[in-house]
Amino acid sequence: MAPGGLRHNPGIAPRRRLAALVWSPDLLSIIQAAGWPIWPLIACSVLGLALVIERFISLKTAKIVPAKLLDEAIMVSRNGVPGPDVVKQLEQNSVLGEVLASGFRTLSGNPRASDEDLRANLEGAGRQAAAKLQRYLGALATIASAAPLLGLLGTVIGMIEIFGSQGADGGMGVTPGGGNPAQLAHGISIALYNTAFGLIVAIPALIFWRYFRARVDDYLLSMELAAERFARHLATLRR
C-alpha cells in the first residue's frame, strides 16, 4: 500500500468509521459507519412505525362504522327522538355514532328544523369525523417523501468526506502518494447505506399511507350514505 494510503491516517473520522465496519459488520457498526445523517432516518422510522400502529388501532371498523349501528339508531327512534342518555350512548359508540347523534340533537333542539338544517348539521359533523379519520396521515406522507431525501443527503455528505480524505492524501489512484481505490470503493458503499436506509423507511411508509387513505375514503363513503339515509328518517320524525 502507498505510504499516503488510508490506513496510515487513522485519525480521520471517515476512516475510523470504515474500520468499525470492517471489524464488526453488524447493524450498530453500519449505523456508526454511516455517520450522523442516519440518525434523522432512524427517528423517522420510529415515528413512522408509531403512526402506523396508532392508525391500525384507531381505524378499526368497530370504532368507525359498526355494521348495525344505523339500523339500531333508526329502530330506537321510530316513535320519536330518543332521550339524552340514548343519544349520549350513541355518540360514544363510534365516529358514525357522533354523526347520527348530531342529527338527533338538531331535531331535539328544533323540532321544526328544515331539511337543509338537518343536512347542514350532519355535514358539519361529517367534516369533523373526516378530520379525525385523516389525523396523522399527513405526517406519514411527509415521512414517505422526506426519508429518501434524507438518505440522499447522508450519502452526499459521506462521499464528500471520503473524497475529501482522499484528496488530503495527495490524490487518488495507485500512484505513489495516492489514495487506495479499494478503500475508496468501500467508503462509497458505506455512504450509500444512507440512501438504502432512506428507501427502507420510505417504501413501507408510502405503502401504509396509501392503504390508510383508501381505508379512510371507504369509511367516508359509508358514512355519507348512512347520513343521507338518516336525514330522510329524521325528516319523517319531524312531520
Summary of predicted features, one role per range:
Residues 182-209, 213:
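Pore-lining and gate-forming transmembrane alpha-helices of multi-pass membrane transport proteins
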Residues 35, 49, 84-85, 100, ...:
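Residue-level signature of catalytic and energy-coupling elements of molecular machines
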Residues 64-153, 157-176, 208-239:
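Predominantly long cytosolic amphipathic alpha-helical stalk/bundle segments
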Residues 38-51, 141-154, 201-205:
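Alpha-helical transmembrane segments of integral membrane proteins
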Residues 7-33, 170-180:
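Short, strongly hydrophobic alpha-helical membrane anchors
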Residues 21-70:
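Hydrophobic membrane-targeting segments
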